[in-house]
UniProtKB/Swiss-Prot annotation:
Reaction catalysed by this enzyme: 5-amino-1-(5-phospho-beta-D-ribosyl)imidazole + S-adenosyl-L-methionine = 4-amino-2-methyl-5-(phosphooxymethyl)pyrimidine + CO + 5'-deoxyadenosine + formate + L-methionine + 3 H(+)
InterPro entries found in the cross-reference section: ThiC, ThiC/Bza_core_dom, ThiC/BzaA/B
Record text on cofactor binding: Binds 1 [4Fe-4S] cluster per subunit. The cluster is coordinated with 3 cysteines and an exchangeable S-adenosyl-L-methionine.
Gene designation per UniProt: thiC
Binding site for [4Fe-4S] cluster: 408, 411, 415
Positions annotated to bind substrate: 65, 94, 123, 162, 184-186, 225-228, 264, 291
GO biological process, one term: thiamine biosynthetic process
Protein name, entry field: Phosphomethylpyrimidine synthase
Tagged with keyword Iron-sulfur: yes
Species of the source: Methanococcus vannielii (strain ATCC 35089 / DSM 1224 / JCM 13029 / OCM 148 / SB)
Length: 426
């Protein structure tokens, strides 16, 4: 049984009750959203995961990517990133490790958080294939499905799988070349496999078998966008839309089989095209939860892409996206450090909160009211408690204090709130 099959049978699960309470919505309404495929709760039956709802009429969620690379393998560093994710309110974590003992790294990450854990299994397939055969493109089909099944057994809650990369989509890419080609790492693995062997993508060809594995463990399928644009010039081109049409068809097959599914979306999109991209996805994929990377709205800000992504992420979430994948200042430059994980996470949470306020989400608005109340009362500790990041403003206040403990050092004796407050007492 999966959350989806239970919902279709009219069963309200404990996970649904938990999410409904967190979101402050009626649990039967939530069950109907899950039944329609508009909401997913990524929770593998083999792991004690905090239930998190992702989808329409819920708060916008934020994911943190972390993991090793061939150039930097330090499990203690990755666990610090997990700790930061836990502390500062991530809703999910994806382990994208490609260096070191991948199963051990994944195991340690899962032991140190109760948040939903996602992976991109084709990374491990590529690493194993390179070690075994000397090249990623020599990966065999048994290895692909064995890795997926093993990760499902370990308790991975959701998996990004690039099932929409097909011979047809590769042909579209070749006929209508783009500026930057394929920038998705998993998408590149499978594109290269198709081009070299002239074979269909096993994840697409044997999709029903894949669904059997995922359904057995209630792993949520996150349909990867292997043809996502890697620069603004490539946004919303034929390759991207061709793949999206395929993903929409696969969403139908997931729902028919009782497998929870969400769809991943583009990463580099001009601001004026974001709303259209969200509407196209929601239409083609029949309101499946939409998971976007950013989107980044300019390619001119390496070192500041947590900001470019937050700008795009806000409009994306207002326009239909349900799940924001954070972007750190290190994006396009190097592997992120621990502090940059925090910066990226907070930036994405700002985007999510701003979007939820714009959409009238009652939980988001309640937090805004609480902050206003705390500011009216000059209750600094309460303000820090409510803030998305409590530590930074507290430190800043201590660095340049005001003589008046109620005021801050910007205005001091000339604080507008205090001035009007004093007049009101007369």
């Amino acid at each position: 049984m999966t959350q989806l099959t239970d919902a279709k049978s009219g069963i309200v699960t404990e996970e649904m009750k938990f999410v409904a309470d967190e979101e402050k919505i009626d649990v039967n309404y939530l069950r109907k959203l899950i039944e329609k495929g508009y909401v997913v709760i990524p929770k593998n039956i083999n792991r004690k995961t905090k239930p998190v709802g992702i989808g329409d009429n819920l708060r916008t969620k934020v994911n943190v990517n972390l993991g090793t690379s061939p150039d930097f393998i330090d499990i203690s560093c990755e666990l610090k990133k997990v700790e930061i994710s836990n502390k500062y309110g991530a809703d999910a974590i994806m382990d994208l490790s490609t260096g070191g003992n991948l199963p051990e790294i994944r195991s340690q990450i899962m032991k140190n958080t109760n948040l939903p854990i996602g992976t991109v299994p084709i990374y491990e397939v590529g690493v194993d294939s390179k070690e075994k055969y000397g090249r990623v493109i020599d990966m065999d089909e048994d290895l692909i499905f064995n890795v997926i099944e093993r990760q499902a057994q370990e308790g991975v809650d959701f998996m990004t799988l690039h099932c929409g990369i097909t011979k047809q989509s590769v042909d579209t890419l070749n006929k209508d070349p783009r500026k930057m080609g394929v920038v998705s790492r998993g998408g590149a693995f499978l594109t290269a496999y198709i081009m070299y062997h002239n074979k269909e993508n096993p994840l697409y060809r044997d999709f029903d078998y894949l669904l059997e594995i995922l359904k057995e463990h209630d792993v949520t399928l996150s349909l990867g966008d292997g043809m996502r644009p890697g620069c603004l010039q490539d946004n919303t081109d034929r390759a991207q839309i061709q793949e999206l049409i395929t993903l929409g068809e696969l969403v139908d097959r997931c729902r028919e089989k009782g497998v929870q599914v969400m769809v991943e979306g583009p990463g580099h999109v001009p601001y004026n095209n974001i709303q259209a991209n969200m509407q196209i996805q929601k239409t083609i994929c029949k309101n499946a939860p939409f998971y976007v990377l950013g989107p980044i709205v300019t390619d001119l800000a390496p070192g500041y892409d947590h900001i470019t992504a937050a700008i795009g992420g806000t409009l994306a979430a207002v326009s239909g996206a349900n799940f924001l994948c954070y972007v750190t200042p290190a994006e396009h430059v190097r592997l992120m450090k621990e502090e940059e994980v925090k910066e990226g996470l907070i930036a994405s949470k700002i985007a999510a909160q701003a979007a939820d306020v714009a959409k009238g989400n009652p939980v988001a608005w309640n937090k805004e009211r609480q902050m206003a109340d705390a500011r009216i009362k000059h209750d600094w500790e309460r303000q820090f408690e409510i803030a998305l990041d409590s530590d930074k403003p507290k430190k800043m206040r201590e660095e340049i204090p005001s003589k008046d403990e109620k005021a801050c050092s910007v205005c001091g004796d000339y604080c507008a709130l205090l001035m009007v407050e004093e007049l009101g007492k007369r």
